[in-house]
Design a protein with these regions (language model features):
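Interfacial segments of multi-pass membrane proteins
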Residues: 83-90, 244, 387-402, 407-413
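Hydrophobic, membrane-embedded alpha-helices of multi-pass small-molecule transporters
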Residues: 19-35, 224-236, 254-255, 268-270, ...
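N-terminal signal-anchor module of multipass membrane proteins
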Residues: 1-70, 77-106
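Juxtamembrane helix-boundary/capping and inter-helix hinge elements in multi-pass membrane proteins
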Residues: 42-45, 88-95, 102-106, 131-134, ...
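Membrane-embedded helical hairpins/re-entrant loop segments and their flanking transmembrane helices
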Residues: 10-12, 16-18, 41-62, 322-399
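Membrane-embedded alpha-helical modules
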Residues: 6, 107-273, 404-518
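Short, non-helical or kinked segments that cap or interrupt transmembrane helices
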Residues: 45-50, 67-81, 138-147, 252-257, ...
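Intrinsically disordered, low-complexity non-transmembrane regions of multi-pass membrane transporters
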Residues: 1-23, 172-221, 278-306, 340-361, ...
Length: 519
């Protein structure tokens, strides 16, 4: 038995046997699938094309980085506002989607593609700057007291998504009913002919009737607004935690896959005993799979994704390109997270992997992958923190596994039943996994602070961390993820990172003089 087998882990340059490789890859695909598909559904891009693009970009990323960085490239939420606000005549893309069943026509996707391709230049430029300036320059601009809390808010800003997925419609229904009841109560108090004009009174009464009608359409007794949805999500969560902690050997490296299987099993039992009204399994909208380059028969088994060519649009470049800046602090935090977790495992073998020094390759790879995804008709993206969490949990850091995950995603995108099966996994199951994964991303931020020895008794460090955490979380939960700053929509994470860099710079003035005085 090899030392690797005893430790039950795989380092970046190690390749599992074929059977294990495929299962590890499938686990990574399941982890990336929800976010990547949701981005496609929100932006109106074709689902199969988006999944194919993420797989293709991941495969290319492996070659671009010399097979040294185990990362999965998936669609990024950072670009949603920019793409949705693009104009098609008098309408925005979001408004067009409401008239086309939620899918953008190919000619509009091609406009967005042009902006996405150019956005890749931003990450490439950042990578070249890092290569020119060296690691010391990067650590001065993005020290651990910046990258650590940035990693933390990446995970914590996703906490709301995890809970809303864990109880998908229960949250929405309860919130809608509470808001509706409150609004009707307020309207009833205001709608008094003695205090308002007849016109205003009529308008308020009409609005009250509309709200009442809408409330009548809210489901009363389905699995989605019952406690059973929590049973599924919590079963998934606890099964995953138990498998991660107590399973040994090969099975101990598949806790997310096994946890998802348990969650699906619980959802299946609820459906079997409760009937159709207790069905948590999902169906992907047919419109999301309608377009294809070529179909076998009616496309119900095999259909090549629909690829579109970009159309020149400088408006798309102006809208999309600046958003790429938001992904740079994320990518930097991700590479430091990965470096810490890989080397924590590598030192048990007497090895060392200097992954942090590959930040330039990582950023350049991200930029080229944006171009590749945009060229075939996929959204812009970034490397996924949830896939890093999966590696940290399973201790499978193998580059061949991520390469295989990319190939697997491309294959799945061509087989309609595969997409339907993976998409059909109940949202509550995904939410159960996300509670663990997104929390793990935040925990990795703490690990960066500990590993780099950041003193929490240093007033500068406390100030930088405090500003990043408060701004990032505050903007995410109060302003919905973006804050308008002189007409520019600044994403929460990017804004927090930039603010943290500025605060760190200002509070570092005079540090060298102070050190010299002490010496």
């Amino acid at each position: 038995m090899t030392k690797r087998n005893i430790l039950n882990s795989y380092l970046p340059d190690e390749k599992p046997t074929t059977g294990k490789l495929l299962l590890y890859a499938l686990q990574q695909v399941i982890v990336m699938f929800p976010a990547t598909v949701i981005v496609a559904l929100i932006t109106g891009f074709q689902v199969s094309t988006t999944v194919f693009a993420s797989g293709l970009a991941t495969v290319c990323f492996t070659f671009i980085t010399g097979g040294k960085i185990p990362m999965y490239y998936g669609s990024s939420f950072a670009y949603l506002t920019a793409i949705g606000s693009l104009k098609a005549g008098e309408l925005t893309f979001n408004e067009v989607m409401r008239t086309t069943g939620g899918i953008l026509p190919p000619e509009l996707i091609s406009i967005a593609q042009f902006g996405i391709i150019f956005s890749g230049l931003v990450s490439i430029a950042a990578g070249l700057l890092v290569r020119w300036g060296g690691k010391n320059m990067v650590e001065k601009i993005l020290p651990a007291q910046v990258t650590g809390p940035v990693a933390m808010i990446i995970g914590l800003t996703l906490a709301g998504n995890a809970i809303s997925d864990a109880a998908p419609a229960a949250v929405a229904v309860n919130n809608l009913k509470s808001a509706g009841d409150a609004l009707i109560s307020q309207l009833s108090a205001i709608a008094d002919p003695a205090t308002v004009s007849a016109t205003v009174n009529s308008a308020l009464t009409s609005l009250g009737d509309t709200v009442t009608s809408a409330m009548a359409a809210v489901p009363e007794a389905t699995v989605f607004n019952s406690n059973w949805v929590w049973v599924v999500s919590l079963s998934t969560l606890f099964a995953t935690l138990i498998f991660s902690r107590y399973l040994k050997g090969f099975l101990g490296q598949l806790p997310l896959l096994l946890g998802a299987a348990v969650g699906c099993g619980v959802a299946g039992l609820i459906y079997a005993f409760g009937g159709p009204e207790m069905n948590l399994f999902r169906s992907i909208p047919e419109a999301a799979l309608s377009a294809s380059a070529w179909k076998l028969g009616d496309g119900s088994i095999f259909a090549l994704p629909a690829f579109t060519l970009p159309t020149v649009s400088w408006a798309a470049v102006a809208a999309v390109m600046p958003i790429a800046i938001a992904t740079i602090p994320e990518s930097t935090a991700h590479i430091y997270q990965l470096d810490i977790y890989v080397n924590n495992e590598a030192k048990k073998r007497g090895k060392h992997y200097d992954i942090a020094s590959l930040l330039d390759r990582n950023l350049i790879g991200d930029g080229i992958c944006d171009m590749i995804s945009g060229a075939v008709g996929g959204p812009a993206g970034t490397n996924y923190g949830e896939n890093i969490s999966t590696m940290a949990i399973t201790k499978v850091f193998s580059v061949p596994v991520m390469f295989a995950a990319g190939i697997l995603a491309m294959v799945i995108s061509c087989f309609t039943p595969f997409i339907k099966v993976i998409f059909g996994i109940p949202q509550a199951v995904i939410g159960g996994l996300e509670i663990y994964l997104f929390g793990a991303i935040a925990a990795q931020g703490i690990a960066i602070l500990i590993e780099k020895g950041v003193s929490m008794f240093d007033s500068k460090n406390v100030a930088v961390i405090a500003v990043i955490m408060t701004f990032g979380l505050g903007v995410n939960y109060f302003f919905g993820g973006n804050i308008n700053f002189f007409g520019i929509n600044v994403p929460a994470i990017a804004g927090a990172a930039i603010l943290g860099i500025v605060v760190n710079f200002l509070l570092s003035i005079g540090d060298k003089k102070t050190e010299a005085a002490h010496n």
